[in-house]
């Protein structure tokens, strides 16, 4: 149960994310783009959609491989943290639907996106950036120094990708770092302590 529970929570989070993405895509069609983004106005427009798709796929492969090889005993915890982050983001994108930035490049057409990506990412699921926050969560919760460096590099490079390709506003990227830190803090300070106390009492009762 301790291993299957977080995996089930992660699957439920992805389903919640899918429903939220479908909703904001429907609502976002009629919403205007935000014009007053100073950073986007200063950055060049560059088509990095290939890295948007394949770079995130490389991150997904890396997080699974790193978990299995360096954090095998903590896989339930890692799965639970990603479930918490994905669920938090799904809630945020429903609360803050926005029109996509002007000049956003289309990511449709890539084989990987058509098979998997279209169920995970949507044109109007903007606040906050999953391409930034999910690698950054790996940086925060994994323990090996070299693994954390790789995650941080993924986070920064994908953050640059979504900005240059006009797939996110700058606030989506900036907020991703702060919200991810908040999710980790909330779990550590508010969720984990009562869970540990409950689990200790449950184990005592079971052994009695």
Residue ranges and their predicted role:
Residues 139-143, 180-188:
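Hydrophobic transmembrane alpha-helices
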Residues 57-60, 83, 137-138, 152-155, ...:
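Residues within membrane-spanning alpha-helices of integral membrane proteins
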Residues 25-34, 38-39, 68-148, 155, ...:
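Membrane-interface loops
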Residues 5-13, 76-84, 150-153, 171:
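Alpha-helical transmembrane segments of integral membrane proteins
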Residues 1-60, 105, 203-207:
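N-terminal transmembrane-helix/juxtamembrane module of multi-pass inner/ER membrane proteins
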Residues 52-59, 129, 133, 174-178:
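Membrane-embedded alpha-helical segments of multi-pass membrane proteins
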Residues 15-19, 86-92, 155-166:
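Aromatic-anchored segments of alpha-helical transmembrane domains
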Residues 125-127, 157-185:
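Interfacial helix-loop-helix junctions of multi-pass membrane proteins
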């Amino acid at each position: 149960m301790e291993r299957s529970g977080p995996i089930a929570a992660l699957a439920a989070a992805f389903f919640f994310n899918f429903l939220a993405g479908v909703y904001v895509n429907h609502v976002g069609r009629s919403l205007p783009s935000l014009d007053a983004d100073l950073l986007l106005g200063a950055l060049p427009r560059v088509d990095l959609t290939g890295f948007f798709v394949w770079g995130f796929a490389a991150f997904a492969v890396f997080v699974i491989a790193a978990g299995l090889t360096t954090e095998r005993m903590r896989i339930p915890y890692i799965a639970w943290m990603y479930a918490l982050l994905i669920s938090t983001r799904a809630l945020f994108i429903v609360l803050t639907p926005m029109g996509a930035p002007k000049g956003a490049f289309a990511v449709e057409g890539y084989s990987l996106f058509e098979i998997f990506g279209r169920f995970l990412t949507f044109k109007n699921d903007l606040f906050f950036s999953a391409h930034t926050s999910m690698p950054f969560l790996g940086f925060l919760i994994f323990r090996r120094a070299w693994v954390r460096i790789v995650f941080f590099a993924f986070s920064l490079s994908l953050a640059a990708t979504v900005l240059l390709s006009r797939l996110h506003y700058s606030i989506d990227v900036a907020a991703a770092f702060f919200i991810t830190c908040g999710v980790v803090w909330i779990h550590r300070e508010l969720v984990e302590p009562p869970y540990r106390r409950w689990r200790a009492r449950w184990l005592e009762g079971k052994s009695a």
